[in-house]
Amino acid sequence: MVHYVKMEDGKVMPIQDMLKSIERYNPEHLKVIEAYVEEQARDNQYDLEANLACLKLYQFNPQLMNLDVTYVILLKALTNFPHTDFVLCKCLLLPAQMNDDTVKEIIYLADILEKCDFTLFWSRVAKNPPFFKKISGFFDSIRKFVCHVVGITFQSIEKQYLVRLLGDVDDNVLRAWVKKNNWKEDGQYITVAVQEGNIKTKHITEKIDFENLAPLMANCL
């Protein structure tokens, strides 16, 4: 669904166009941007530029800061690991946001994900599942990142270990992720794509001018 914002001259503009103009700094558009952030959470969409614009407006207008919207923005950034979206969002947080206990917990979760300590991540999430369920597709987005890490780290992995990394999923969910990543079950192990197949040779060409080579040739005479 396309969101529109109303300009001072009465004209309407798609929110994506507004974000490319100076109007992105107009606090009168904040409510529309916040509604767009909430829609992302409901419909499993993601628009980093809109979310950054929202945080920037909070910076310029601290009295308008909304913690609930802040939570959504940070959680959506988590779903886009391993990209650096979360770092960008964190850099725009106000002291009032940084001192909030829930924001601190989300930042801690980001740190855990960055360290790839997935079992600890899921144990923290399990303490308050409804909070994360507000973000449609949150769990699957994290599992996609888990599979990304597994795919570049292992040639084979014990099935039960993978189950734990994915958040203690059942057999059906496990098989779905194995199939999605073109892995294969082999008894108690999961065979991941052969690493040699992912290694690409790199050709390096260095140009050496004759002027640079002449002194060396002279020394060899």
Curated annotation (Swiss-Prot):
Under the heading SUPFAM superfamilies, the entry gives: ARM repeat, Winged helix' DNA-binding domain
Give GO MF terms, alphabetically: ribosome binding; RNA binding; translation initiation factor activity
Record keyword Cytoplasm present: yes
The yes or no answer to whether the keyword Translocase is present is: no
Question: Where is it predominantly found?
Answer: cytoplasm
| Keywords annotated in UniProt | Cytoplasm, Initiation factor, Protein biosynthesis
Q: Pfam families under this entry?
A: CSN8_PSD8_EIF3K
Pinpoint the PCI domain residues: 46-207
Q: What is the annotated localization of this protein?
A: Cytoplasm
Q: Name one GO biological process term.
A: regulation of translational initiation
Q: Which InterPro entries match?
A: ARM-type_fold, CSN8_PSD8_EIF3K, eIF3k, PCI_dom, Transl_init_fac_sub12_N_euk, WH-like_DNA-bd_sf, WH_DNA-bd_sf
Can you cite an annotated GO cellular component?
eukaryotic 43S preinitiation complex
What functional role does this protein have?
Component of the eukaryotic translation initiation factor 3 (eIF-3) complex, which is involved in protein synthesis of a specialized repertoire of mRNAs and, together with other initiation factors, stimulates binding of mRNA and methionyl-tRNAi to the 40S ribosome. The eIF-3 complex specifically targets and initiates translation of a subset of mRNAs involved in cell proliferation.
Task: Provide the family line.
Answer: Belongs to the eIF-3 subunit K family.
Query: How does the record describe its quaternary structure?
Result: Component of the eukaryotic translation initiation factor 3 (eIF-3) complex.
Under PANTHER family, the record lists: EUKARYOTIC TRANSLATION INITIATION FACTOR 3 SUBUNIT 11, EUKARYOTIC TRANSLATION INITIATION FACTOR 3 SUBUNIT K
- What name has this protein been given in UniProt? Eukaryotic translation initiation factor 3 subunit K
**Which species is this UniProt entry from?**
Aedes aegypti
